[in-house]
A protein has these predicted regions:
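Glycine- and acidic-residue-rich phosphate-binding/metal-coordinating active-site segment common to enzymes
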Residues: 144, 150-163, 167-177, 182
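Glycine- and small hydrophobic-enriched segments that form the cores of compact globular domains
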Residues: 85, 114-119, 131, 135-138, ...
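Conserved phosphate/anionic-ligand binding catalytic regions in large, soluble enzymes, centered on
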Residues: 107-125, 169-174
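Acidic-glycine-rich active-site phosphate/pyrophosphate-binding loop
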Residues: 87-104, 139-158, 203-211, 246, ...
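Generic N-terminal targeting/processing segments that precede catalytic cores or assembly contacts
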Residues: 1-108, 131-132, 241, 248-291
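Active-site-adjacent structural elements in folded domains
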Residues: 107-110, 160-166, 218
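Alpha-helical support elements that line or immediately flank enzyme active sites
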Residues: 123-134, 179-187
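Functionally critical mobile loop/hinge segments
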Residues: 184-291
Length: 291
């Protein structure tokens, strides 16, 4: 995918009178030299892995540190008992984000979308729609192409690495990708998709990467939920016609600049933020003594 800006993607779709997913797919095929059948087969495989991660989730599984596991089923049970807010979809999104992020912490197979630390965001917003029959596999794969296209632009213009840009580059990027996937899936115009991405990333600008004990668990697992719910809200706003004052490309550029301004303590080193709290330090010391 050779697009270097969101505006290039939108212009390609407009000039060829094709959907955003088709414009991104054509660009990817031109760069990768793959056949369309092969490319789609690979995307379907990624979607199937996302589904398998959720399907194979074990409520009893715990990470080696003991910091992660068992929370997704708590959310599901609370919703079944009428104790949750936000309705069926939001409860499912929350549970699915936790499931995938917990599986990552427990060394299970996940799809890095775009990173392992943010792997729960994108599948969380799509899996409930697939299960309810609101979206078929082909439509979801088209939405994944759109998500990938925007992710590629973020990678090209800024970064996807927490060590370089903080958590805004991981969960923030994943949230933007999930927002555009939802917007496209629900029939949003290319401009609405770009607005959804801009809102989602803009909302998480400045989010630091501060993993306790250097593990992708606390606060990473729960931040996947924030990224997913943020994506839903931003997609809803964009689909309603709500615009964003700052263009998507400029939001991405701002994220890159903010990342470069963050202290190294707040970029995956486990030296600042929550990792530097008394409890965070105590957890790290305890785990170090046990290893």
């Amino acid at each position: 995918m050779s697009f270097l800006s969101c505006e290039e993607m939108l212009a390609a779709a407009r000039s060829q009178n094709i959907s955003l997913s088709e414009a991104i797919l054509r660009s990817d095929l031109a760069e990768s030299r793959l056949t369309e059948a092969h490319s789609r087969e690979m995307m379907h495989h990624l979607w199937q892995v996302m589904q398998a991660t959720s399907r194979d989730y074990d409520p009893a599984q715990r990470s080696r540190s003991g910091l992660s596991g068992g929370d997704a089923v708590k959310v599901e049970q609370a919703h079944q008992e009428g104790k949750s807010l936000g309705g069926d979809y939001l409860a499912a999104v929350t549970a699915e984000a936790l499931k995938t992020a917990e599986c990552n912490a427990c060394m299970k197979r996940i799809v890095a979308a775009p990173t392992a630390g943010s792997c729960g965001v994108l599948p969380a917003v799509l899996l409930p729609l697939a299960r309810s029959g609101e979206a078929d596999e082909e439509s979801i794969c088209d939405a994944l192409y759109v998500a990938a296209g925007f992710g590629q632009v973020i990678a090209a213009r800024a970064t996807l690495a927490g060590a370089e840009g903080g958590c805004q580059a991981e969960v923030g990027a994943a949230s933007a990708m999930a927002a555009v996937a939802l917007c496209h899936l629900k029939g949003g115009a290319p401009e609405q998709c770009a607005a959804a991405a801009a809102m989602a990333l803009g909302n998480l600008l400045g989010l630091v990467c501060d993993p306790v004990a250097g593990l992708v668990e606390v606060p990473c697992v729960k931040r996947n939920v924030v990224g997913a719910v943020n994506a839903v809200s931003c997609a809803n706003m964009a689909l309603a016609g709500v615009d964003y004052a700052i263009p998507c490309d400029e939001v991405i550029d701002a994220m890159g600049r903010v990342g470069s301004l963050l202290s190294p303590d707040l970029r995956e080193t486990g030296q600042g933020g929550l990792a530097a709290t008394p409890t965070g330090v105590r957890i790290a010391q305890t785990l170090a003594e046990q290893s």
